[in-house]
Amino acid sequence: APLEPVYPGDNATPEQMAQYAAELRRYINMLTRPRY
């Protein structure tokens, strides 16, 4: 299973937050993808 991305913290840069959001979306997509 993919590793859950680590939250960069409340004082993270916008770039870090965007990177985290993208990784989190990909992580959730992999978790919710149906397994046939």
Curated annotation (Swiss-Prot):
An example molecular function term from Gene Ontology annotations: neuropeptide Y receptor binding
Subcellular location as annotated: Secreted
GO terms for cellular component: extracellular space
Record-listed Tyrosine amide modification sites: 36
Cited InterPro entries: Pancreatic_hormone-like, Pancreatic_hormone-like_CS
GO term, biological process aspect, one: feeding behavior
Short name of one Pfam family: Hormone_3
Keywords recorded for this protein, A-Z: Amidation, Hormone, Secreted
Role of this protein: Hormone secreted by pancreatic cells that acts as a regulator of pancreatic and gastrointestinal functions probably by signaling through the G protein-coupled receptor NPY4R2.
Similarity comment text for this entry: Belongs to the NPY family.
Protein name: Pancreatic polypeptide
Organism of provenance: Tapirus pinchaque (Mountain tapir)
